[in-house]
Swiss-Prot record:
Gene: endou-c
Domain EndoU: 32-303
Record function comment: Endoribonuclease that cleaves single-stranded RNAs at 5' of uridylates and releases a product with a 2',3'-cyclic phosphate at the 3'-end.
Biological classification of the source: Eukaryota, Metazoa, Chordata, Craniata, Vertebrata
Residue positions the entry lists as glycosylated: N287
Name recorded for this polypeptide: Uridylate-specific endoribonuclease C
Originating organism: Xenopus laevis (African clawed frog)
Enzyme class label: lyase
Gene Ontology CC annotation, any one: extracellular region
Length: 303
C-alpha cells in the first residue's frame, strides 16, 4: 500500500446545529488500535452490497509521480470508469438513497445550502437504510459497548448531526457539511476540496463534468473495495490528489470514516482490510461546536 499525504481544505467558520443529541463521552483511549482494526475487518467481510469484481472496470492508464500530481497535466486520454453495473449496484437500497442525496448541494462554497423538507427526508431515508445493514449494526454495537453512546438511537441522532449539520467554509453563509465535503465535494478557493466518494466521482465523469488525469496510488486489494488516489479536474478546477474507496457500499464508507472520526479524531487511524493495514485521516472543525461541545466532520479519507 502506498502511503501518501493528502491535504483537505478545512472550513474557516462554523455555525452550530439545532440538533442536541446525547453527549458523546471523551473516551478515545477506550478503543485500542487492535479493536479498531478488528472491527474494520468485520466491515470488510460484511459488505454484501459492495461491487463484485465484474461490476466495475477501471481504466487507470497513467501513473503519475509525486512531481507530476500537481501539474494538472492530462495523462489519460480515456475515462477512468470503463464500466459500472448501475442496474445492479444503484438498485440496492443504500446506493439508491445515496444517489438521491448527491444532487442536493451547490458546487462552490460561498453559496448558502438550503435544506428543504424534501432533502431532510432524503437524509433520514439514507440513515434509515444504512441502519438496516449489518455494517452499521456492528458499528453501533461497538460504540455502545465502549461507552461512546448509550443506545443505537443516540448514535443515529449524533451521526446525522456530525455529518449533515451545516457550517461555513467562507466566513459567510452556511455553505458546507461533512457529508457534502466528503461524499459530494466542493470547489473552494479555486480548487477541488473533498470529494472522496467513488459513486459521486463516477457520476461526475459520466456527465462530463470531471476529466480524469492520472492515478498516483493503487491499493494492494485484488477485489473491491480497493483504495486509489486520482488526479482530476472538475470543470476547470484541479484536484491534485484525491483518495477513494472504490467499489465499496455507502454504509461501508460511512462506517469506516465514522469509526475513525469518533475514536481517533484529528488523527491518522490505523485500520485493516483483508489483512492489510492502511490509514484513515480524520479532521474535526475546532472553532465551533454543536450539541454539548461536539464537533462536525470537516473531512475524512483513506491513505
Amino acid at each position: 500500500m502506498v502511503y501518501l499525504v493528502f491535504l483537505c481544505l478545512l472550513p474557516s467558520l462554523i455555525s452550530g446545529a439545532s440538533i442536541l443529541p446525547e453527549p458523546r463521552k471523551d473516551v478515545r483511549a477506550s478503543a485500542t488500535d487492535a479493536e479498531i482494526q478488528s472491527l474494520a475487518e468485520q466491515f470488510y467481510a460484511a459488505d454484501t452490497n459492495k461491487a463484485a469484481s465484474g461490476d466495475i472496470t477501471l481504466n487507470l492508464q497513467y501513473k503519475a509521480s509525486s512531481s507530476q500530481t500537481s501539474t494538472g497535466t492530462d495523462y489519460a486520454n480515456q475515462k477512468l470508469f470503463r464500466y459500472v453495473n448501475e442496474a445492479k449496484l444503484f438498485a440496492r437500497p443504500t446506493f439508491a438513497r445515496l444517489v438521491n442525496l448527491l444532487d442536493n448541494y451547490a458546487q462552490k462554497t460561498g453559496s448558502a445550502e438550503s435544506v428543504p423538507t424534501t432533502e431532510v427526508n432524503e437524509q433520514n431515508a439514507f440513515l434509515d437504510e444504512i441502519f438496516k445493514t449489518s455494517i452499521i449494526t456492528k458499528l453501533s454495537n461497538f460504540f455502545i459497548s465502549k461507552g461512546y453512546y448509550s443506545s443505537a438511537a443516540s448514535f443515529k441522532t449524533d451521526l446525522k448531526a456530525m455529518w449533515f449539520g451545516l457550517y461555513t467554509r467562507t466566513s459567510g453563509p452556511l455553505d458546507s457539511s461533512g457529508f457534502e465535503h466528503v461524499f459530494h465535494g466542493e470547489i473552494h478557493k479555486g480548487k477541488v476540496s473533498g470529494l472522496h466518494n467513488w459513486v459521486k466521482l463516477y457520476l461526475l465523469e459520466k456527465s462530463g463534468q470531471v476529466n480524469y488525469l492520472s492515478y498516483s496510488a493503487d491499493g494492494v486489494w485484488k477485489g473491491y473495495p480497493d483504495i486509489y488516489a486520482f488526479q482530476l479536474k472538475w470543470s476547470t478546477y484541479l484536484k491534485t490528489i484525491g483518495s477513494f474507496f472504490v467499489g465499496s457500499s455507502p454504509e461501508f464508507d460511512i462506517a469506516m470514516y465514522t469509526l475513525c472520526y469518533v475514536t481517533r479524531p484529528d488523527s491518522l487511524c490505523s485500520v485493516k482490510m483483508g489483512g492489510s493495514i492502511f490509514k484513515i485521516q480524520t479532521y474535526t472543525w475546532a472553532n465551533s461546536t454543536y450539541g454539548n461541545g461536539k464537533r462536525f466532520v470537516a473531512s475524512s479519507y483513506p491513505i
